[in-house]
């Protein structure tokens, strides 16, 4: 079962997309279609951003958006 890192969860509700069409958008607010685009183009970027984006994708694609909403309220 997918178990995201607690620190990563906190980061995805605070950090913004640093480039591209959704530059400045909170990572947790990125649409699934944009995350799927990364996958079609060969995958998420390397490093921490890639881990954050893949975490957002896993949460959203499995219908667990409530996790993100709860964390956003807490920040």
Region spans (language model):
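DEDD superfamily 3′-5′ metal-dependent exonuclease/proofreading module
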Residues: 1-75
């Amino acid at each position: 079962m997918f178990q995201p890192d607690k620190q990563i969860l906190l980061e995805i509700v605070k950090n913004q997309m640093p480039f591209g069409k959704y530059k400045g958008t909170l990572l947790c607010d990125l649409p699934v279609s944009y995350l799927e685009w990364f996958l079609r183009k060969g995958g998420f970027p390397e490093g921490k951003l890639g881990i954050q984006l893949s975490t957002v994708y896993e949460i959203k694609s499995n219908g667990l958006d409530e996790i993100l909403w709860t964390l956003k309220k807490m920040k």
